[in-house]
Amino acid sequence: MARSLRKNTFVSNDLLSKIDNLNMNKEKKIIVTWSRRSAIVPAMIGHTIAVHNGKSHLPIFISNGMINHKLGEFVPTSIFQGHAKKDKKSKNEKKKN
């Protein structure tokens, strides 16, 4: 279900204040955050934000195409290891016996 239009996009206050300080000083530093639910706003363009994936912080460079998406969309929380392979060797041994 989509978010109501009368509500603004959510951005963590701490994250927004860090972005504003860097923009005022015209600095480019990596910002570390745990706020995966924060939306990407135009003030963040050009910055690198390290978002927590549950284990470590992964850096994301913010570009124009990412506006109005959430930070957590760009950092996977789990890695697909593949499906379990069938053990053919044990089946062949059972058939021979």
Curated annotation (Swiss-Prot):
Pfam families: Ribosomal_S19. GO terms for cellular component: chloroplast; mitochondrial small ribosomal subunit. It is found in: Plastid, Chloroplast. One of its GO terms (biological process) is translation. Gene3D superfamilies: 30s Ribosomal Protein S19, Chain A. Its main location: plastid. Keywords: Chloroplast, Plastid, Ribonucleoprotein, Ribosomal protein, RNA-binding, rRNA-binding. One of its GO terms (molecular function) is rRNA binding. InterPro entries: Ribosomal_uS19 (IPR002222), Ribosomal_uS19_bac-type (IPR005732), Ribosomal_uS19_SF (IPR023575). Coiled coil: none annotated. Protein S19 forms a complex with S13 that binds strongly to the 16S ribosomal RNA. Belongs to the universal ribosomal protein uS19 family. NCBIfam families: rpsS_bact. This is Small ribosomal subunit protein uS19c.
